[in-house]
Swiss-Prot record:
Homodimer. Signal peptide: none annotated. Substrate binds at residues 16, 37, 64-73, 128, 190, 199, 219-220. It comes from Prochlorococcus marinus (strain SARG / CCMP1375 / SS120). This is Orotidine 5'-phosphate decarboxylase. Pathway: Pyrimidine metabolism; UMP biosynthesis via de novo pathway; UMP from orotate: step 2/2. The gene is pyrF. Its EC number is 4.1.1.23. It catalyses: orotidine 5'-phosphate + H(+) = UMP + CO2.
Length: 240
C-alpha cells in the first residue's frame, strides 16, 4: 500500500517540562522529527528566541499560546507571533469571531512584513482535559460538550481561519462538516497501554488519523521515554 502522507508529518511533538538544553538534546535524538509544539511553559522560560532556534534546526513550529483577549490585544499579539516564523498559532475560539478575525488579519500582516508566509491560525474549541460531567458542573454551560465543540468550530470557520484544535473524539463529526484543507489538530493521543495522564478524551494515533485528524499532538509518550527515538518511530509505524 502506498501512503498518501508521510507519517512523520502527521506528528507534532510537545516540548513540555524541559529546559532549553534538554529540548535540544532531545531533538538531536529525533532526526525524523518535523513538527514541534512550543507551549506556554517553554515560551515563558525561553522567550521568542526558542522559535528561531528550533527553526534553525530545521523544525516547523506550532506555537500553542492559546491567545484569548479583546480583539485589539489578540491582533497585536498574533502580529508579533507571526514574525517569529511559527507555522501554526493557536487562539481560543471563545474569544469570539471579531477577535479571531483581528488575530488572523494581523498575523498575515506581521508575517508579510518580515518576508514570511502567513501562519495558519487554529482555534481551540474545548480543552481535552475537560470531561463531559465536569464541563457542565464547573462551567455551568447548558450544552453538551459535543455541541459546544461544534459551535466553536463553526465560529472558527466563519471567521476565516485555517482550522481548529479538538479532541480526537469530535474529529469524525467535524470532518464531515469541515472537509480538507480545514485542519483538525488533535491532542489527547495515546498508544494502547500508555498512561492517559491528565487527558480525558483520547484515541490511539491510528484511530485519530482514520477519524479525520490532520495532525496529532504527542508528548510524554516520547519525551518521557528512555529511548525517545524508538518511541517516536513506534508511533510513526502505527500510522503505516
Amino acid at each position: 500500500m502506498t501512503l498518501s502522507f508521510k507519517p512523520e508529518d502527521k506528528l507534532i511533538l510537545a516540548l513540555d517540562g524541559m529546559s532549553g538544553a534538554e529540548v535540544f538534546m532531545l531533538i538531536e535524538k529525533l532526526p525524523n522529527l518535523i513538527w514541534v509544539k512550543v507551549g506556554l511553559e517553554l515560551f515563558t522560560l525561553l522567550g521568542p528566541q526558542i522559535i528561531n532556534q528550533l527553526r534553525d534546526r530545521g523544525k516547523k513550529v506550532f506555537l500553542d499560546l492559546k491567545f484569548h483577549d479583546i480583539p485589539t490585544t489578540m491582533g497585536r499579539a498574533c502580529y508579533q507571533a507571526a514574525k517569529t516564523g511559527a507555522e501554526l498559532i493557536t487562539v481560543h475560539a471563545c474569544a469570539g469571531k471579531k477577535g479571531i478575525e483581528e488575530a488572523n488579519k494581523s498575523a498575515v500582516k506581521g508575517a508579510k512584513e518580515v518576508g514570511l508566509p502567513p501562519p495558519s491560525l487554529l482555534a481551540v474549541t474545548v480543552l481535552t482535559s475537560w470531561g463531559s460531567k465536569d464541563f457542565v458542573q464547573e462551567l455551568g454551560i447548558q450544552q453538551s460538550l459535543d455541541q459546544r465543540v461544534s459551535l466553536l468550530a463553526n465560529l472558527a470557520s466563519s471567521a476565516g481561519i485555517q482550522g481548529c484544535i479538538c479532541s480526537p473524539l469530535e474529529v469524525m463529526k467535524l470532518r464531515k462538516d469541515f472537509p480538507e484543507p480545514f485542519q483538525l489538530i488533535t491532542p489527547g493521543i495515546r498508544s494502547c497501554g500508555e498512561n492517559i495522564n491528565d487527558q480525558n478524551r483520547i484515541m490511539t494515533p491510528l484511530e485519530a488519523i482514520d477519524a479525520g485528524s490532520s495532525k496529532l499532538v504527542i508528548g510524554r509518550e516520547v519525551t518521557s521515554s528512555e529511548n525517545p527515538s524508538d518511541a517516536f518511530n513506534r508511533i510513526c509505524s502505527q500510522l503505516i
